[in-house]
Amino acid sequence: MKEVLIPSQMESLYQRLQNVGLPKSYVKRQGLPDWWCEEYEQSEGAIVTAAAHISKRFNLDLQSLLNGQDQPRFVLTSQPKYKLQNGTDPQSLSMSSAIAAKVAEIVASACKSPYEPIELSVAEIREEILDSWRFVTLKSLLDFCWSHGIPVVHFDQFPKATGIKKFQGMVACFHQRPVIVLSLKDSSPSRLLFIAAHELGHILRGHLSLTDASLLVDEEVKRESKDQEEVEANEVALELLLGRSDKSYSTERNYTAQYLADYAERVGFLDRVSPGVVALNYGWHKNHWGSANGALKLLEPNANAPRQINRRLLKNLNWDSLGNDYQEYLELALGLEQV
């Protein structure tokens, strides 16, 4: 007669997490402390310790992890406002939203600067930035946001699982402040600049409540969106970066990447528009992305926008206010040991 092997409590937990889209490898890498080992996993009480860490890091209900008959449940105290592409099921973004919301909550709790609501027009914000900078760039927009107590974080460490979608940008409100979360995995500062400006537009236009745990999630930021709030956020971003929301750098003929890069530097200097933004604007209006992407590579050599964003975050958090587990998790989830 064959012996029936009964899975351990930890293996059962891993399997239940796998069933909701959290692979064991991801859970062990992101959800458990660095001292965790196979030997400890076999000890009495390991399941309780593991569940406590995993629930805190991934925004999961603790009791649903401890009860072996339950399906693990993500915890969101308010229904996110999703801005979706046609055909996207909101449920497919629930996991990424919950995990990113926890990162935003941790960041908000440790932000050094108090939140100062922005009582300026878009034109006045642009003018304020240009008083200190030649262009509105990712770096200068980060300066502005942090000066008003609005953290900006880049987080893209989501599990890879069938049916689980990621998003490009989010505004999450915790501890009476908005937090901008960028999740597009892209090294270009100009691309992430537009998404950050778009998310700032949602804040300026009052598209979400500043009460705790409110979320606005942009699956994808597109210039051609017909959603009224997306149109308004795009208009804010365009006016902030270009000076006018209807400004176009389209040309009659198609440019090569090198010619576009030279053109972008020339007209960008005159118009006080970042050359990378000029190149993207050309690509949007001409639908000539080969040259636009090539120009960005020439204009932004060796760029690492996610690192730039999180390096700034590293300097603006009160790390002593966080417990050891949250410190370790942020460093791991945001790649801070590499910035």
What are the residue ranges of the model-derived segments?
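Active-site hotspot residues in diverse enzymes, especially metal/ion-binding acidic/histidine motifs
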Residues: 1-339
